[in-house]
Structures are given as C-alpha cells and as structure tokens.
From Swiss-Prot:
The protein's name: Small ribosomal subunit protein uS17
PANTHER family registered for this protein in UniProt: 40S RIBOSOMAL PROTEIN S11 FAMILY MEMBER (PTHR10744), SMALL RIBOSOMAL SUBUNIT PROTEIN US17M (PTHR10744:SF1)
Assembly mode: Part of the 30S ribosomal subunit.
Sample GO molecular function, one term: structural constituent of ribosome
Keywords, ordered alphabetically: Ribonucleoprotein, Ribosomal protein, RNA-binding, rRNA-binding
Role played: One of the primary rRNA binding proteins, it binds specifically to the 5'-end of 16S ribosomal RNA.
Name of the gene: rpsQ
Any single biological process term in GO: translation
Homology family: Belongs to the universal ribosomal protein uS17 family.
Length: 86
C-alpha cells in the first residue's frame, strides 16, 4: 500500500520564540464565490523545527506530518530564503 502525497506549504516565519517550534504564515489566493474577486487569505501553522535553525522573516517550506503536539502537525523541510538582518 502506497502512502498518499503529503501536503506541502510555503510561507514566512512570523514567530520563533518557542523551543523547537516556529509559526509560519501561509498566504493563499482565493476567489470570492459571489463577487469573483481574488482575496488573499493568511493562515498560521505551528511547525516543528528540530534544530531551531529558522528565524523570523525566513521563507520556509513545511510538510504535513503526524501530530507532534496539540497544535503541531507540520514540520520544517527547508529554509528557501534567509531574512536580511539589518
């Protein structure tokens, strides 16, 4: 039996204050059913970051995984772009 393809999302890290956890904001373009206008929706996901390597502002790829805690069902796959530190 094959495992189904897991969901993958791309977003920006908005919080890294927890130990081994990051909060990733993912933006989705959705068309309004009645007014046919494109709306940008933002959803936040808590993701597991084993080595605490992601920082605020980084662009990251997260993948769905087994439940790690009450709110965490995603894990960090890779950091695609580092935030610019001023």
């Amino acid at each position: 039996m094959e495992r189904t393809q897991r969901k993958v999302r791309v977003g920006k890290v908005v919080s890294d204050k927890m130990e081994k956890t990051i909060v990733v904001a993912v933006e989705m373009k959705v068309r309004h059913p009645l007014y046919h206008r494109t709306i940008t929706q933002t959803k936040k996901f808590k993701a597991h970051d084993e080595n605490n390597e992601a920082k605020i502002g980084d662009s990251v790829v997260i993948m769905e995984t087994r439940p790690i805690s009450k709110d965490k069902r995603w894990r960090l796959v890779e950091i695609t772009e580092r935030a610019v530190v001023l």
